[in-house]
Amino acid sequence: MSERKLFTSESVSEGHPDKIADQISDAILDAILAEDPEAHVAAETCVYTGSVHVFGEISTTAYIDINRVVRDTIAEIGYTEAEYGFSAESVGVHPSLVEQSGDIAQGVNEAFESREGDTDDLSHIGAGDQGLMFGFAINETPELMPLPISLSHQLVRRLAELRKSGEISYLRPDAKSQVTVEYDEHDKPVRVDTVVISTQHDPEATNDQIRQDVIEKVIKAVIPADYLDDDTKFFINPTGRFVIGGPQGDSGLTGRKIIVDTYGGYSRHGGGAFSGKDATKVDRSASYAARYIAKNLVAAGLVTKAEVQLAYAIGVAQPVSVRVDTFGTSTVPEAVLEAAVRQVFDLRPAGIIQMLDLKRPIYKQTAAYGHMGRTDIDLPWERLNKVDALVEAVKTVL
């Protein structure tokens, strides 16, 4: 009997409470960066019934209307009705942002290397904290992402499209998806075993209507027919009712969907969240750099699967470690790939910021439906412009 394995990933919609918080935090970051690209920002958000709290630390010359940014973000998501228990115009907004700690700022503004006499401009900025970050790529999908998280994101995005277009008028903003994919003995995806979708809805909508619409207009529109069969299981709103949702149903907090934001659990995660953080925070920028490296390694044909780990010390520019794990799929030794990566990519925080142009207000668009593998928006860490350089670097190392 051939060995078959199941792997499951989930996603959540832009109307999920934790994702509302992420989007508000990144909307604030973008608003600040639009006026002050040199700003340091760590903006956290908590949402619950009728209330939004924004707190954290910033260093900036910009002035922004946080109240307006919060309300506009909530309205764009779709919380515009008082009956939702959380609406853009009636919600209470409570900002509490303070100046960044001077002890942290001194290590970011002047890295250890700079204090030791390194005059290179890209050695001037130190990592905003210690930590480890992972990036991943695999040849399962055109965007080089694991199939379970790719499908999960597409399902909740499709729900949002149908809601906003009015094609399914009873949908409300909160939703979740989960996809279980079956893999063969060679770790190739062969079918979708289970799909779970929970979507908030108006009280008048019936379970039969919701089930039919979700299967026909969402699942079958997203998942290729080759992956679906008579044994594929669909669980649509399995509790039987999902009228109360969003922050009225559950509180939400920035940074609580880090697996949804990345690879759906298919790859390791260093633990640091992204939203609300400027690019001097390596939790965010180095995770993007690691994805950039992994994706270009796979696209170059050097590997079929790659996980890249980067690690940093606070106030130090150079990473303390760079590791490439290819799970036995590399055409050359992993040590060669690591040396090539160090040749091609400048992994100091300032190097990453320059390489990926990260001082721009580009972050709010990443705060729902994943930071990695996006095909609907142009993200610099998703570009395949280092393929040739990596191939040449491998040759020089060998």
Curated annotation (Swiss-Prot):
It comes from the Bacteria. GO terms for biological process: one-carbon metabolic process; S-adenosylmethionine biosynthetic process. It is an enzyme of class 2 (transferase). ATP binds at H16, D174, A175, K176, R241, F242, D250, R256, K257, A273, K277. Catalyzes the formation of S-adenosylmethionine (AdoMet) from methionine and ATP. The overall synthetic reaction is composed of two sequential steps, AdoMet formation and the subsequent tripolyphosphate hydrolysis which occurs prior to release of AdoMet from the enzyme. GO terms for cellular component: cytoplasm. K(+) binds at E44. GO terms for molecular function: ATP binding; magnesium ion binding; methionine adenosyltransferase activity. It is found in: Cytoplasm. Binds 2 divalent ions per subunit. Belongs to the AdoMet synthase family. It catalyses: L-methionine + ATP + H2O = S-adenosyl-L-methionine + phosphate + diphosphate. This is S-adenosylmethionine synthase. Mg(2+) binds at D18. L-methionine binds at E57, Q100, D250, K281. The lineage of its organism: Bacteria, Bacillati, Bacillota, Bacilli, Lactobacillales. Homotetramer; dimer of dimers. Its main location: cytoplasm. Transmembrane segments: none annotated.
